[in-house]
Amino acid sequence: MSTFKMIPLIILLIPATAKADAQTCMAEAMYFEARSQGVLGMLAVGVVIRNRVDHPAYPSTVCGVVRQGRLSDGRVYKWQCQFTFYCDGKPEIPTDPEAWTTARSLAKIVLDSRLTMQGLENATHYHATTVQPTWARRFRPCKQIGEHIFYVSR
């Protein structure tokens, strides 16, 4: 096979791999951050991730957004990540097969469409109602879904 014929094959494989990685990163975040919040809660987390990908202040990939907080040498400081599950010291192993299947399906929907949710069109942050992070004062609350409060820039 000539080099010329191999180039299109390589070009076609890169996006498919990147898309699979993006779906896994998105599904993990939706699952670990909001599986107890049902479909709407998981979708809301996915919308926030996609909003960040589209925003110039954040990484331009889903995995980059989800993993933001990892140091360049690969270390992670506990509780210093943008998404708590990623640096809580626990392994990311789904234990609820039904919720994991739902998260994978919802991640595909969020990634393959321009799905948005009313009130979350520009949301880039959220937190659980059980905490009051200091960063929240710098943002405007825009919606509560389940046990999460979502925010937009002021």
What are these regions (language model features)?
Residues L13-T17:
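N-terminal signal peptide c-region/cleavage motif recognized by signal peptidases
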Residues D21-R154:
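Bacterial extracytoplasmic/cell-wall-associated proteins, especially those involved in peptidoglycan
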Residues I7-P8, A18-A20:
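Cleavable N-terminal signal peptides
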Residues M1-I10:
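Sec-dependent signal peptide recognition
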